[in-house]
A protein has these predicted regions:
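Short secondary-structure boundary motifs at beta->alpha junctions and helix caps
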Residues: 87-94, 166-206
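Surface-exposed short loop/turn segments
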Residues: 29-49, 114-166
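C-terminal motif of bacterial Sec signal peptides marking the signal peptidase cleavage site
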Residues: 22-25
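A structural "domain/chain start" motif
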Residues: 27-101, 213-215
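Bacterial N-terminal signal peptides that target proteins for export
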Residues: 2-15
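Sec-exported extracytoplasmic/periplasmic mature domains
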Residues: 108, 112-116, 144, 208-215
Length: 215
């Protein structure tokens, strides 16, 4: 008397068990988590008011070189200085725009509003346009900072240089600009972005005041 071969049944049972495990595995895959990263800009939510178009009253032609950042600032993560030689990079708090471009844009806009100025060019400069002065800005601090008193503040410092152009160019002025410390709570990064924007506005005003009224 022949006995049925049990192997096919075992194989079918094994396949069924594997299938059940696969289905169960699909049900226990954790749901995708929301990205916790937040992005910030230096510009506010309000749109700039459009003023009536007027012919410029000034004659100066200014070139704004691309803003340079200390290497540790040249990144998307916002920076918090926690000691004299220690910084913390905020992986989930980032700048939406490159900082050099954002600061250049604000400074250029402020210079265009200065009465002695007729035109402002951003680097790379057009070959067919002469310039009276060039402005260079090296940012050495652009961060939240923890002070020795345990309190946080916004910190911006930059070296600003104004020079003439052409073959015989010379430096007209060179100074270290430090924005007044503004209190920050160390947690609200939207507020830190607002404070640093206010500091950039002060920097832009300083640059405008450094431009001589005549070439």
């Amino acid at each position: 008397m022949s006995h049925p071969n049990p192997r096919p049944r075992r194989i079918r049972a094994l396949c069924a068990a594997i299938g059940l495990l696969a289905i169960a595995g699909c049900n226990v895959v954790p749901p995708a988590q929301e990205d916790a990263t937040r992005y910030f800009v230096l510009s506010g939510a309000e749109l700039p008011a459009l003023a009536a178009v007027q012919a410029p009253t000034g004659t100066l032609r200014i070139g704004v070189k691309t803003v340079r950042l200390e290497s540790y600032l040249n990144r998307k993560e916002m920076v918090v200085r926690t000691g004299a030689n220690e910084v913390r990079f905020e992986d989930y708090r980032r700048w939406a725009d490159p900082l050099d471009a954002a600061v250049t844009r604000i400074v250029r806009s402020r210079l265009l509003a200065a009465p002695p100025v007729a035109q402002v060019f951003a680097e790379p400069f057009p070959f067919d346009q002469a310039r009276d002065f060039d402005v260079s800005i090296d940012i050495v601090r652009f961060e939240g900072a923890l002070g020795a008193d345990g309190k946080y503040s916004a910190s911006l410092a930059a070296v600003v240089e104004v020079s003439t152009t052409g073959a015989g160019s010379r430096i007209v002025s060179r100074k270290l600009f430090e924005a007044p410390a503004q209190a920050w709570d160390g947690e609200d990064f939207n507020r830190l972005a607002q404070l640093l924007r206010a500091d950039v506005d002060l920097l832009a005003q300083e640059v405008a005041s450094d431009i001589p009224e005549k070439p």
